[in-house]
Amino acid sequence: MSKFNLYSDYKPLGDQPKAIKSLVEHYKDGIKEQTLEGVTGSGKTFTMANVIEQLDKPTLVMSHNKTLAAQLYEEFKEFFPDNAVEYFVSYYDYYQPEAYVAQTDTFIDKESAINEEIDRLRHSATQSLLTRDDVIVVSSVSCIYGIGSPEDYAQFTLTLQTQQEISREDILKELVKMQYSRNDIEFIRGQFRVRGDVIEIFPINANYALRIELWGDEIDVIYKIDALKGDIIEELQKVIIFPAKHFVIAKEKQETAIANIKKELKERVDTFKATGKYVEAQRIEQRTNFDMEMLQEIGYCSGIENYSMHMNGRKWGETPYSLLRYFPDDYLTIIDESHVTVPQIRGMYEGDRARKENLIQYGFRLPSAKENRPLRFDEFMRAQNQVLYVSATPAAFELGRSKNKVEQIIRPTGLVDPEPIVRPIKNQVDDLLGEIRKCVDNNQRVLVTSLTKKMAEDLTDYYIKMNVKARYLHSEISTLERTEIIDELRRGDFDCLVGVNLLREGLDLPEVALVAILDADKEGFLRSQTSLIQTIGRAARNVNGRVILYADNITDSVRNAVNITKHRRKIQIAYNNDHNITPRSVVRKLKDKKIEEKVDDIQEIDNITTDEIDEIIKELEKEMKQAAKDLNFEKAAKLRDRIMELKEE
């Protein structure tokens, strides 16, 4: 019987049944890598869920950013309410890694703000992987970064049950070893408090606390309690408590690690002194000795991950521990939006290494800090068992490695791909003006992509002079303002949005009936086959969707993008005719305007006192933290940008 139970009001439709059947059969036949190529809106996530249920194995779902990962996490939680659906992304609301700028002799210390809720979810993910076999972890690229060894992490669990003979002192010692700290006043995750023979523990992965009541050296009763009010939720017979941090090691291993770190330190100091670098020698000696004292005293130090090679007992160049090591041997990895996520995985190692080289060269870190790193791409691929690449535009890498590719071209809504039209570049601006006016007459919106920021601004100015309600969008506009502009387009406050790279906005706007691609024959990143197909897809949410590509030369990218779109459109129209389906535009509610109204209320800064601004900032910070806790990162980003603007005032 399957461990995964998929709940949905829908059954697979269109291309979904065929795609699910093909993928599952090939995986069961031993195929390692496959690709699901599905157009926007074809229900790829539902197909992924069906594959997980039928393969019946733990699954890692990777996405290229936190917001998309949060959306997938929510969808999979709805599909699999009986199973462990977990979320593993970076727990930093804000993160400035330590760095050194040699030109100005400036050391930038690590600065971060940890999101406690995401930290809880990260621990929940690792604990589920070690205790259950019905786990789905939705993750960003964070899953390839170093965390502690799963063996050490599992070794430090504390199992408590009623009638167990154990003294109060022994329980407290174990909790301290597991990096829990005592705090009898403030009670938060990763802490415990003691009142006589009653110990209350707030597990790192929980929204509740545990109350252990002892009778002498025996556990009398265990309760799950409300952490804030202390009310009893239920009585428990047995509990398993996991460490408060992912980096935990036994005392003996720690002593060996410290000895090896000191040995490396001596070699590094000698090297610096031999080359006359006395400042660097003093710096590395002082910093490392301070960390070692902290380790010996409390078993932890700030930046402990930089000593992970020694802590884990790894050799130079050996693959570091990451979330992947917590999965069993037989698991599935689904890489969503693989055309973006795969290159992102590739790039993590080199970027991390370049920053560390500077820190090591100038005596801020030991050379072994380089071994606290994300996985190299070859290490990531070696760690895989079976992989599913998912994208509307899979890249050559995915297609080249996949033994089977399945297509999802039919949308459940019956929507077909927009009609692609190629026109000459001559008079493209005025030709497009006529098309925009037609759309405005039909209460439709228009997206226009230009090659440069200057062109986007000039084009917008020209169209405004021609009485078109137009706005532009590019990378210099803040996150807050970008989101507001997109919402205003949907509401009809203006009709035409001009941008450079509209792909980065994640624009799926049902109101957009025309997408115009200017200078479509200028080969490059934004006019590649993949980018053109992705841009064309921006008009695929409207039943009247069209795309105009302005090009004098039919490049391979233009030809392939147009041919692929026409091919899909032909299949979709034939399917609709055969099944008597009438296409209908996607209907999507506009977002809640409460935040926008709050921002509007405080636009007139000149009329507000400094104290009032401080109060507004406090209120917005509270809302920002709640939004991040709720995994609503778009809302959190808007609030963060507004807070920064207010602080500048």
Curated annotation (Swiss-Prot):
A motif (Beta-hairpin) lies at residues 91-114. GO terms for cellular component: cytoplasm; excinuclease repair complex. SUPFAM superfamilies: C-terminal UvrC-binding domain of UvrB, P-loop containing nucleoside triphosphate hydrolases. Residues 428-594 form the Helicase C-terminal domain. Keywords: ATP-binding, Cytoplasm, DNA damage, DNA excision, DNA repair, Excision nuclease, Helicase, Hydrolase, Nucleotide-binding, SOS response. Coiled coil: none annotated. ATP binds at G38, V39, T40, G41, S42, G43, K44, T45. It is found in: Cytoplasm. The UvrABC repair system catalyzes the recognition and processing of DNA lesions. A damage recognition complex composed of 2 UvrA and 2 UvrB subunits scans DNA for abnormalities. Upon binding of the UvrA(2)B(2) complex to a putative damaged site, the DNA wraps around one UvrB monomer. DNA wrap is dependent on ATP binding by UvrB and probably causes local melting of the DNA helix, facilitating insertion of UvrB beta-hairpin between the DNA strands. Then UvrB probes one DNA strand for the presence of a lesion. PANTHER family: UVRABC SYSTEM PROTEIN B. This is UvrABC system protein B. It comes from Methanosphaera stadtmanae (strain ATCC 43021 / DSM 3091 / JCM 11832 / MCB-3). The lineage of its organism: Archaea, Methanobacteriati, Methanobacteriota, Methanomada group, Methanobacteria.
